Structure formats: C-alpha cells, structure tokens
C-alpha cells in the first residue's frame, strides 16, 4: 500500500530586498512524497531548491500553500497549525537533516556525535550509544566509532551525518547537496546508501543536488527552474516496493 508521507500543495515564497524590490523564490510548488521513496530535485543555483527544503522542513514559513505531513496538517490558512515549541518538537522527532557541510562537533567522536540527539531527548546515554553504534556499524563504520571527525575521510564524515539524521527514526530526511564536497566514488556510495535506507527503513528522502547522474538514482526526479517545480524523470526501479 502506498502511504503519502508528505503532501505540499501550491507553496509560494518571496523575499523583499532593500529598496522594496520583491523576488519570487517559489511559485505554486506542489510535491507529494510517499513512505520509503527517494526523491531528488535538480536545478541551477538560485532556482529555489534550498528554499523549498527549508519550507518542507518547517525551517521557514511559506507565503501561501499547504503542508500535510503523514496526514497531519502542518501549514494551512497562511500559518502553522502548531505552536513554535510544538513545531520544533515535531521537527526533531519526524524529520532528519543532512547538509553539504556535515557540521559534526570537532571535539566529539563519531559515536558521540550520533548519540547526542537521543541522549538530549531521553537522558539515557547508554541506550543512545547502543543505538548510535548500531547505525554506524550498518554504515560500515564499526572501526571508526571512537574517531574524531578530523580523523575521518569526507565520505565517512557524511555517513556519520546521515546516521545522526536517522538517530530519532525520522519519517523524512531532507538532504541539501549531501555529496557536494565528495569525489565521484564517495558520492556514488553515498547515494547508494541513501537509496538502501529508504527501502529498508521505509524512510522518505528528498535530496537536492546539481548532479543529474546521481539524481537519476532516485525513484523520482524533479527539476526546479525559476521557482517552478516539474517532474524531470519518472520510472520504476526493480528494487521498488
């Protein structure tokens, strides 16, 4: 059964610059993503990709449109349906974030970086470390648990960042140019890892990238241009559920 995880309808966003000139960043963007689906969004710099991720992740506020997450309305009638505190709690439980720059804490080991979110939420350090170790081992980092970020390769650092994003078992992961600083081999491995996670854990991924080759590894690919979103390529994989 296909379960819709995220349903965003007619999202628009504009900014007013100095001199009161208004720039329309997003214009009536509609996107529906299903459970366990990997979706990529390609487009030139400044096309609105990152702004869209920020709206979908409730990090910014749309001018108009609706956002429904797992059948729960989050944004409608030009406002969020939850208080700021409740929205932050919802975001921390349901959404994971991966960025081009991993933002790992330099004085903490890979294990500690991943375990921290759950430890802060539950206060149970031992359980958090067990869960973090399981994730990192699943990502091929069992021998890197006690290494600092500076002791890891770029590909390993991004795998740690993805493990951290998955620590709270989110329903959706938003990734903004996650392979931007990686070489071709590590980029390929990273996308293969995200594709595997999406199917094994039924976690939806929305990935912004400028690389069309990696984008084609997704279940669906969209193209963003001048604030408008259109489907670039749609096909079924033999591995799709």
Curated annotation (Swiss-Prot):
PROSITE patterns: ABC_TRANSPORTER_1 (PS00211), ABC_TRANSPORTER_2 (PS50893), LOLD (PS51244)
Membrane topology classification: Peripheral membrane protein
GO cellular component, as recorded: plasma membrane
Positions with a binding annotation for ATP: 43-50
Enzyme Commission (EC) number: 7.6.2.-
Domain ABC transporter stretches: 6-241
Cited SUPFAM superfamilies: P-loop containing nucleoside triphosphate hydrolases (SSF52540)
Pfam families on file: ABC_tran
GO molecular function term, any single one: transmembrane transporter activity
Record family assignment: Belongs to the ABC transporter superfamily. Lipoprotein translocase (TC 3.A.1.125) family.
Subunit structure: The complex is composed of two ATP-binding proteins (LolD) and two transmembrane proteins (LolC and LolE).
Function statement: Part of the ABC transporter complex LolCDE involved in the translocation of mature outer membrane-directed lipoproteins, from the inner membrane to the periplasmic chaperone, LolA. Responsible for the formation of the LolA-lipoprotein complex in an ATP-dependent manner.
Protein name: Lipoprotein-releasing system ATP-binding protein LolD 2
């Amino acid at each position: 059964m296909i379960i819709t995880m995220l349903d965003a309808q007619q999202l628009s966003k504009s900014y007013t610059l100095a001199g009161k000139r208004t720039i329309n960043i997003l214009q009536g963007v509609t996107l529906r993503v299903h459970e366990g689906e990997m979706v990529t969004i390609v487009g030139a710099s400044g096309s609105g990709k990152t702004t869209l991720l920020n709206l979908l992740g409730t990090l910014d506020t749309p001018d108009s449109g609706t956002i429904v997450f797992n059948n729960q309305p989050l944004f409608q009638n030009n406002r969020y349906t939850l208080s700021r505190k409740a929205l932050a709690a919802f975001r921390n439980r349901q959404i994971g974030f991966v960025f081009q720059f991993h933002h790992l804490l330099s004085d903490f080991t890979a294990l500690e970086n991943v375990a921290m979110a759950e430890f802060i939420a539950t206060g149970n350090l031992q359980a958090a470390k067990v869960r973090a170790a399981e994730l990192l081992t699943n990502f091929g980092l069992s021998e890197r648990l006690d290494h600092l970020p500076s002791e890891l390769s770029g590909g390993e650092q991004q795998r740690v960042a993805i493990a951290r994003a998955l620590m709270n078992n989110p329903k959706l992961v938003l990734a903004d140019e996650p392979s931007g600083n990686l070489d071709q081999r590590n980029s390929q491995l990273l996308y293969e890892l995200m594709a595997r996670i999406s199917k094994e854990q039924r976690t939806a991924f929305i990935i912004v990238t400028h690389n069309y080759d990696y984008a084609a590894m997704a279940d669906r690919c969209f193209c963003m241009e001048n604030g408008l979103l259109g489907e670039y390529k749609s096909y079924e994989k033999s591995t799709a559920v």
